[in-house]
Amino acid sequence: MEPLTIVSLAVASFLLFAFWALSPKTSKNLPPGPPKLPIIGNIHQLKSPTPHRVLRNLAKKYGPIMHLQLGQVSTVVVSTPRLAREIMKTNDISFADRPTTTTSQIFFYKAQDIGWAPYGEYWRQMKKICTLELLSAKKVRSFSSIREEELRRISKVLESKAGTPVNFTEMTVEMVNNVICKATLGDSCKDQATLIEVLYDVLKTLSAFNLASYYPGLQFLNVILGKKAKWLKMQKQLDDILEDVLKEHRSKGRNKSDQEDLVDVLLRVKDTGGLDFTVTDEHVKAVVLDMLTAGTDTSSATLEWAMTELMRNPHMMKRAQEEVRSVVKGDTITETDLQSLHYLKLIVKETLRLHAPTPLLVPRECRQACNVDGYDIPAKTKILVNAWACGTDPDSWKDAESFIPERFENCPINYMGADFEFIPFGAGRRICPGLTFGLSMVEYPLANFLYHFDWKLPNGLKPHELDITEITGISTSLKHQLKIVPILKS
């Protein structure tokens, strides 16, 4: 270990002890929670590859609303639909902020995106643009040709590898990346491979453990240990690529409205004005990064889980294939066909319930002191909503941890944010605005995979032997990538 690192850790340890010893002991009526260790509080209890499961297990012991002390950060975790409703509906305005983090400030241009921007007029207007212009149902439909073209390419690859194992995980990640990049940037990104590589480094950074995040007074560690310099270098790489994209869009002129990519839309909004603030290139880049980072990992992980569950349940695979092959006429699936694929939609719903792409929703922050379920929640408290625990709540779902798509037959519950037992995209003001786009990246590819190919496990593996161990980053995915064998449809 370098001498500077040793000295830094020694200084940090001393300061941590000082923070702990001198910090005022609260007398507020906080929610119950597990015992706190000196200095670190409950940080050690989140050091797990599946923190959503750890928190659900703690909630069984300490209650559906639970207080954790994560270093210097007071944190409240809610784990049931009733308490999620309290946070995201009853008191939504009080919990509409995001915590300020060094990484969101660096990567998203001082948090001028939609995901990390603080609640206020800027966020409201940018969210409105996103909802009405960028990710409306009409706009998502306009990208259908991009999805269709990419699925044709993938199908040809699978045909050439029929009868041999393919890495389904890698294939779907590449597919989702290609569609999102083209829908967002058009054909103007000359270095997509570098862009995607840096984006994944950003995603890893956002989900990685960082001691200074739990001790605001230790931000100097990010400088001394070289983390901040590394993050700034990554941000500079992204900024250079996005700057070239904006220049390319401006040089080629404006596309027709039905051919606009998302950068076209944002530049049009920037040029026409009409907002209470001047839209800058930094605002455009921040929102573009939102689009690129938010959907990539989550859509591919959902596809991976859906196919995994179908491989583990051959009777469900058979029913889904029979449906899609009876509905589709000819060699090509149209997105209109999806409206008739009722069982496939049940499969996607059940996948989102049991394998929520973001099991712990993006953290919120309490804007003003309030009371939830009889407990005091001080201002600046960090709020974690365990969407996975809500989706597997035994009081809301029978056989909650079993994969049963049929549970959604004739069931009015949906993922639009009104039913708090099923919130894979969040709810309230901070619900994911890319919901429709994300679903299009799951339903249409899945239908194609089931229509054109039969599938089997490699090396004589039995369905019940398929390893479904989880690992959590930005989203929860399989620890071991899914490898399966495509067989040409007879």
From Swiss-Prot:
A GO term, aspect molecular function: iron ion binding
The organism of origin for this protein: Lactuca sativa
Domain of life the protein comes from: Eukaryota
GO annotation (BP), single: terpenoid biosynthetic process
Membrane topology: Single-pass type II membrane protein
InterPro entries in UniProt: Cyt_P450, Cyt_P450_CS, Cyt_P450_E_grp-I, Cyt_P450_sf
First-listed, main subcellular location of the protein, grouped into a coarse class: membrane
Keyword Transmembrane part of the UniProt annotation: yes
PANTHER family: CYTOCHROME P450 (PTHR47955:SF13), CYTOCHROME P450 FAMILY 71 PROTEIN (PTHR47955)
Ranges annotated as spanning the membrane: 3-23
Keyword Protein biosynthesis: no
Keyword annotations of the record: Glycoprotein, Heme, Iron, Membrane, Metal-binding, Monooxygenase, Oxidoreductase, Signal-anchor, Transmembrane, Transmembrane helix
Gene this chain is encoded by: CYP71BL2
Name used for this protein in its record: Costunolide synthase
One Gene Ontology CC term in the entry: membrane
Cellular compartments annotated: Membrane
Binding residue positions for heme: 432
Cofactor(s) the protein needs: heme
UniProt pathway: Secondary metabolite biosynthesis; terpenoid biosynthesis
Enzyme Commission no: 1.14.14.150
Family according to the record: Belongs to the cytochrome P450 family.
Enzymatic reactions: germacra-1(10),4,11(13)-trien-12-oate + reduced [NADPH--hemoprotein reductase] + O2 = (+)-costunolide + oxidized [NADPH--hemoprotein reductase] + 2 H2O
Glycosylation sites: 167, 255
Biological role: Involved in the biosynthesis of germacrene-derived sesquiterpene lactones. Component of the parthenolide biosynthetic pathway; parthenolide and conjugates are promising anti-cancer drugs highly active against colon cancer cells. Hydroxylates germacrene A acid to 6-alpha-hydroxy-germacrne A acid, a precursor of sesquiterpene lactones that spontaneously undergoes a lactonization which yields costunolide.
